[in-house]
Amino acid sequence: MANAKDLKVTLVRSLNGRLKAHIACVRGLGVRRIHSPVVVKDTPENRGMINKVSYMLKVEEA
């Protein structure tokens, strides 16, 4: 199950018209569709991708 070192990431804005690098970050996190949450580990790599596209995501502790 999820523990304190997991993050629940949800895409809340569309990827249409975004930079290719930002789309790659969202895909790298495993998010596929708007409003479908994904649980990822809280690592520096994932935090970096989340920070880069934070304007499109909602992040909660899982």
UniProtKB/Swiss-Prot annotation:
GO terms for biological process: translation. The keyword Ribosomal protein applies. GO terms for cellular component: cytosolic large ribosomal subunit. CDD domains: Ribosomal_L30 (cd01658). Disulfide bonds: none annotated. It comes from the Bacteria. Gene3D superfamilies: Ribosomal protein L30, ferredoxin-like fold domain. InterPro entries: Ribo_uL30_ferredoxin-like_sf, Ribosomal_uL30_bac-type, Ribosomal_uL30_ferredoxin-like. Keywords: Ribonucleoprotein, Ribosomal protein. Transmembrane segments: none annotated. Belongs to the universal ribosomal protein uL30 family. This is Large ribosomal subunit protein uL30. It comes from Thioalkalivibrio sulfidiphilus (strain HL-EbGR7).
